[in-house]
Amino acid sequence: LKKEIVKLTNEECEVAGIPALYHDVFTSGIHYVDFMFDIKHIRQEDLPYVGLLKAVLGYVDTEHYGYADLSNEIDLQTGGISNNILGTADVENIEEYSLKFEVRTKFLEDKTGAALRLVKEILCSSDLDDEKRLYEIIAQSKSRLQMAIGGMGHYMAGMRAMSYFSKTAKISDLT
């Protein structure tokens, strides 16, 4: 390990008129792309639905793929596509925070077009009206959460306690 800290540079640019950050670092030919959507305007009582959206995007049918075929295509064309909700506190004012919905993917250079088409397919044409499939996903999420609580109850209790004092912890608890 080197003792020096590697300095990262953020290069601000525009891609198709959209603000972007570029990091010129060696990645062995793997491209990492994060799409960030500002969701701070969403009311607090609606945040659990954003958490649900995070859970279902990529796991429901889209315009061109059934969910099983979509999963196979994601595996073939990318190193995965994931969704996250990021709440980060302002370092200068703890009462202020930013809230983003993140869609993250990684892929090899020759798969760029296919990977970005899949992200667009998921974001723009996911079928959120299939109640049976949504129920399956919610039931799976509930089961995973119940199993996690069994092994990490102390962590969950700590996160809930923090949610009473921290806006970002509250967002994490709600989503």
Please give the residue ranges for each predicted region:
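Proteolytic maturation boundary segments
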Residues: 1-48
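M16 family metallopeptidases and their MPP-like homologs
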Residues: 28-60, 64-125, 131-175
